[in-house]
Amino acid sequence: MELIIISGRSGSGKSVALRVVEDLGYYCVDNIPVNLLPSLVRSVSDNYDKIAVSIDVRNLPKDQQQFNDILEYLPDFAKPTLFYLDSDDQTLIRRYSETRRLHPLSIDSLPLDLAIKKEKELLDVLVTRADHVIDTTDLSVHQLAESMRETILGKKDKQLIITFESFGFKHGIPKGADYVFDARFLPNPHWEPELKPLTGLDQPVKDYLASHSIVQKFTWQIQTFVQTWLPHLERNNRSYLTIAIGCTGGQHRSVYLAQTIGESFAMSHPNVKIRHREQEK
């Protein structure tokens, strides 16, 4: 079992880091008391093989040995990896000023700057055990997310799930579409008697559409658009991208385009799905 423990000073980005890990398929628990960690792992081990927890300063043992003892109580099948997030004091003060949130140690009537310094002292129990220390002082939310993914997955690029979906405008635009392309201006096989009962998956329709230069150009332009902006979308903390291509009824032109372009991208991207909405009815 993979067990990720996320901790660090308040305001350093623990919540962002936990959301990233959750998007990677981990079962996540926020702000769990450390002494409950072994029990949690045992109770969910039958259903989950990837767990992540966040720990803040209020849920820590008082000394290093106590923390080590708790980790020793973990079952042998759990392999913990500890991420420690931190920022410099001035950055943390600025972030708290911007969000107007109360620091967890301010309940002791400590001024913010002293609460931040005291928190650092209390968290020393974790720093010495950290497998990865991430300084978020100069990182944006997206950069922190990318750093977490890179460390966990062992590679920089997140594998986006790309769906190419055909549809008919007369049945409505797909609600989950990120980009919509209108193919209704292209030559329509519907008006060819021998092609009318077929779909864009049938070879005669493919041959008919591929023979028109305007179809070839439109196909190329959609491919180029997606290929150009895909790296930026992958870095933007996305999990899914849906490219919807529509024609009048969702039978010929849009089906041909979604299938052709989807197959092209599937040759170089591992997570490509092709869906023909109207053909599923």
Swiss-Prot record:
GO molecular function, one term: GTP binding
Chain positions recorded as ATP binding sites: 8-15
Pfam families (alphabetical): PapZ_C, RapZ-like_N
Binding site for GTP: 56-59
Keywords on record: ATP-binding, GTP-binding, Nucleotide-binding
Function: Displays ATPase and GTPase activities.
PANTHER family: RNASE ADAPTER PROTEIN RAPZ
Annotated family: Belongs to the RapZ-like family.
Protein name: Nucleotide-binding protein PSHAa2554
